[in-house]
């Protein structure tokens, strides 16, 4: 009887530890500039915003200039606007920080599975395993494109007047590219 009770207790402990490790560590941050509440998540050892920034600045827009798209997808920012958009205590991630983020996800899930693991469960048919909740907010170049199909994020790293963007798009890749600084992408802020 004693051993059966110990076995049951040990099973509960193992289950609790497994759940604690598997579930993302989440929180909420309130942006004092406009009162907007953002979900946060710890990935690796870093705290990220778990949704796209929706703070209005010059050189930021809603997809198709529709306010309801800002509410659903966050704002799209030029590179210069993105560099200034994060609240105090947060920053636009550098390429190295995005690379470490990508490596953490791919080392945990594999390159192909990372695509599904990052995508939103309810807005993009993914598993959102890490609570990062990537949504297909599209982008703006000369026109608005990719809504419902792709996600694009700025890094703070620039080169020769252009800047690095990180792109999650079909067929299932999360890749970095150097892009015109006038493009408009989503912003995810990283806690300092």
Predicted regions and their residues:
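Conserved positions within compact, well-structured domain cores
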Residues: 23-192
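Short, Lys/Arg-enriched N-terminal segments with co-localized hydrophobic residues
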Residues: 1-5
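Sec-dependent N-terminal signal peptides
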Residues: 8-19
């Amino acid at each position: 009887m004693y051993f059966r009770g110990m076995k049951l207790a040990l099973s509960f402990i193992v289950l609790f530890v497994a759940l604690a490790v598997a579930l993302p560590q989440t929180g909420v941050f309130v942006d004092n500039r406009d009162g907007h509440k953002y979900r946060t998540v710890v990935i690796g050892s870093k705290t990220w915003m778990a949704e796209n920034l929706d703070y209005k600045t010059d050189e930021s827009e809603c997809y198709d200039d529709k306010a309801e798209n800002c509410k659903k997808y966050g704002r799209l920012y030029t590179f210069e606007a993105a560099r200034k958009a994060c609240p105090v205590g947060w920053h636009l991630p550098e390429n190295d920080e995005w690379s470490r983020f990508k490596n953490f996800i791919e080392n945990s899930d594999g390159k192909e599975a990372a695509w599904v693991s990052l995508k939103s469960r309810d807005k993009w048919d993914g598993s959102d395993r890490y609570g990062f909740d990537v949504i297909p907010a599209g982008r703006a170049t000369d026109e608005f494109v990719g809504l419902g199909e792709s996600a694009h994020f700025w890094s703070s790293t620039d080169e020769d007047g252009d800047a690095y963007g990180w792109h999650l798009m079909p067929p299932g890749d999360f890749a970095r590219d150097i892009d015109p600084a006038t493009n408009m992408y989503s912003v995810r802020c990283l806690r300092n």
